[in-house]
């Protein structure tokens, strides 16, 4: 995460606003390449979750992997042929062709990543993520030192890093790749079964991404690549925190799959309560980040107002990923998750259309994004609360209130005044939540002492 922050502060410093916009457009498109494995990775993750490596049917998994590579290669060849015959701007063609290349590499990498997490070898996946980040930052630092402002080279660095991470996963999964194959008929049947199981989760994930994605597509179309770049910069700051929470949720899944119903209920209540309690403190980080960005990247000062409006996404989407989505997967309620995400996507699309093409307001688009994410979290918690027979806590509503106060203060007042007002509100909040905070602090201390022992 620190490496991501480091590069995200350096790259926009060197690239112009337009070039940075194309770089962010590539990152944006690349985030959707997972659609084209059609749920294969998700299916393997769900079917093999909790199964140790020594009990894994390696020949079956190997056959499924190569079957997935073949049908994705066919799609990439068709897409590349179409792109080369089309008359788009050269910069957009570079972005789209690079995305086609990343599709194969990233989906192969994702297959191993999901598999390692499913068989409870999360450490290997974590190492691959570190290798990916380090392999990216080394060439990027070289480009920055050379003051190379061509976004295409940064895309090449991304592809290189993802390839190195894939190579690491191949080495760690070599026993699987050399285990042999099952028959073609069995391979097709097993692949189809994985897609059938995983497609609901895939489309739920896709709908989840499009809740924010439709707004980003609209911003690119309505306001152009420079505004898209500025909004994407603000979203990239939000994404740093989200990436950390997603890694935590991946670790929770295998453990919760093996827990009984009462243990799952206790875990749900605990995780939900902890996230509600600590979430208001997340907003404090806005003020030092605002100061640093305004000084280091004055051309992105406008992005910080966008960041203030978008920061609640960390709270609501973070809770969704770490708590709600994890428990929907554990309870095998992918269909329910899909319905919630599709319903929220429709709301997001309507809000985006009205904001962008009726009101013509970028700020309304951003507020619509946050509103959609909040509603998704609310719907999900309502469903899970019914399943576990628990009620919404008062802390949940206070968390929503603190989010509203933060946006109000950041939008209406100068930074120093907004900071003072929010700290005052946070002190009042901490006073009324002192019992919960003390329990949380005691729990953290016990964990730290236990680690030392």
Regions found by a protein language model. Give the residues of each.
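Helix-loop junctions and terminal segments of transmembrane helices
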Residues: 37-53, 238-275, 325-330
């Amino acid at each position: 995460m620190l490496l991501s922050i480091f590069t995200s502060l350096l790259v926009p410093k060197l690239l112009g606003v337009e070039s940075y916009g194309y770089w962010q457009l590539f990152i944006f498109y690349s985030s959707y390449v997972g659609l084209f494995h059609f749920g294969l990775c998700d299916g393997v993750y769900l079917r093999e979750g909790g199964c140790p490596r020594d009990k894994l049917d390696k020949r079956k998994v190997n056959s499924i992997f190569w079957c997935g590579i073949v049908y994705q290669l066919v799609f990439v060849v068709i897409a590349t042929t179409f792109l080369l015959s089309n008359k788009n701007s050269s910069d957009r063609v570079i972005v789209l062709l690079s995305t086609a290349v990343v599709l194969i590499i990233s989906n192969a990498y994702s297959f191993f990543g999901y598999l390692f997490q499913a068989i409870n070898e999360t450490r290997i996946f974590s190492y691959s993520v570190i290798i990916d980040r380090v392999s990216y930052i080394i060439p990027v630092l070289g480009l920055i030192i050379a003051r190379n402002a061509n976004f295409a080279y940064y895309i090449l660095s991304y592809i290189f890093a993802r390839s190195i991470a894939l190579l690491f996963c191949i080495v760690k999964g070599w026993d699987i790749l050399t285990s042999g194959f099952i028959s073609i008929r069995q391979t097709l049947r097993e692949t189809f079964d994985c897609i059938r199981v995983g497609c609901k989760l895939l489309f739920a994930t896709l709908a989840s991404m499009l809740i924010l994605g439709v707004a980003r597509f609209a911003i690119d179309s309505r306001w152009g690549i420079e505004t898209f770049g500025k909004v994407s910069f603000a979203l990239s700051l939000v994404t740093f925190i989200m990436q950390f929470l997603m890694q935590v949720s991946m670790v929770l899944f295998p453990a919760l799959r093996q827990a009984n119903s009462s243990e799952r209920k206790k875990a749900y209540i605990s995780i939900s309560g902890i996230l509600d309690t600590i979430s208001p403190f997340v907003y404090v980080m806005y003020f030092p980040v605002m100061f640093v960005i305004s000084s280091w990247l004055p051309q992105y000062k406008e992005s910080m107002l966008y960041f203030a409006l978008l920061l609640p996404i960390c709270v609501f989407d973070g809770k969704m990923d770490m708590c709600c989505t994890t428990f929907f997967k554990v309870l095998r309620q992918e269909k329910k998750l899909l319905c919630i995400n599709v319903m929220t996507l429709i709301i997001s699309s309507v809000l985006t259309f009205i904001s962008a093409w009726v009101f013509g307001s970028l700020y309304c688009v951003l507020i619509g994004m946050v509103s959609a994410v909040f509603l998704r979290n609310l719907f999900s918690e309502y469903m899970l609360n019914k399943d576990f027979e628990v009620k919404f806590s008062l802390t949940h509503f206070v968390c929503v209130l603190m989010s509203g106060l933060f946006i109000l203060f950041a939008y209406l007042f100068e930074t120093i005044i907004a900071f003072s007002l929010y700290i005052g509100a946070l002190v009042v909040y901490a006073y009324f939540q002192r019992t919960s905070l003390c329990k949380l602090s005691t729990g953290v201390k016990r964990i730290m002492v236990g680690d030392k022992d």
